[in-house]
Amino acid sequence: MGKRKTMQSFNLESFGKNLEKKLRRNPEQLQQPIKNYKSERERDIHELIYTIKSERMFIYKNAHRHLKLALENATLALNLPMLLKDFHVTLKEFDALEASLNAELECLELQYSSDTSELLLPVNSVNTSQNTINENAITTAIASLSVNPVNTSVALSTASTSTSTPTNTTTTTTTTSNSLTKNNNSALVSKPKTRGVRSKPIDMNSSDDEEDDQKDDQDKDDSDEDNVDNTPPLDSNDSKPPSSKTKGISKTKTKGNVSTAITTTTTPITTTDSNIIGTTTTTDDITEESKVKERPPRIFPENCYVCKVTETPYWRRGTDNGVVVDLCNECGLYYMNKEKKERLSRQKHSIKNVLN
């Protein structure tokens, strides 16, 4: 028997392009039905739908040809999954576009119905009867406001319930002077501020306890700088309401052995009455020496200890018989690598001695 002839290998990309050209020459276009379109947009939508259908048929035929080629030649089957994936993506896009066009076409058909010559309302429109009811309710509410300007809640309730006539109700919200004073007092009086572990408010009657509490606050502020309230101290000339409570601690620090001044000013809580309960203001000036570790100034050596170079991008330090000396960058790197090699050689010799 004779030998089986081997099939020639085809280039899949070139074959696909040639197939596309052949199909483009004689495409199987769908027959569009003759229809009297009522608008240009409706005609455009129908044309787009028919072109989508013809493109979908072309993709199906192209995929069928590629499958046949992959079955005949195994080398072409390597690119088949990628091609089928691309076909699937394009078909999904066509389906989404066709669905949107069909939805738009349905909306146009609803607007131009064949039964009546009048245009139908769109889906999002509101009923006219409901609009008239709301307008009547709003007009009645405005009329009730013009007659009885106090009964605002009644007018708003009539507008919400959409009634034709306003109801004569006498339930109105009135505010008396006592309630106003209570509200003002409750709004202006502030709660005592607690700091640290202390849970009791500041006692207004005893001044000794207040001074002790202030000293404790100063000690806590020295230990924790995050809790410091950096507000300026109160001035005697400033006019502030008696109900306000301000607690400010001004703290200034400088570097070096310089004394720091800490000023604490506290104004206690008072009521809104004209008779002010005792207000005490204490100012303690505490001076203490602050010890701040400053970075020593950078000193540049005169020259290198080995090569006597005066300028180098980076100065290094080494030891010569226990004495610290200044080295330039090149000399420092040289002796550092040399010391590293000597250390590694000593380690190797020690390992050999242990093994032997």
Swiss-Prot record:
A molecular function (GO) term: zinc ion binding
InterPro entries registered for this protein in UniProt: Znf_GATA, Znf_NHR/GATA
One cellular component term from this protein's GO annotations in UniProt: nucleus
Compositionally biased tracts (Low complexity): 158-188, 260-284
Annotated disulfide bonds: none
UniProtKB keywords: Coiled coil, Metal-binding, Zinc, Zinc-finger
Coiled-coil annotated spans: 91-119
Residue spans of biased composition, Acidic residues class: 206-228
Zn finger (GATA-type) start-end: 304-331
Domain of life: Eukaryota
CDD domains in the cross-refs: ZnF_GATA (cd00202)
Residue ranges, annotated region (Disordered): 158-294
GO biological process, one term: negative regulation of transcription by RNA polymerase II
This protein's name: GATA zinc finger domain-containing protein 17
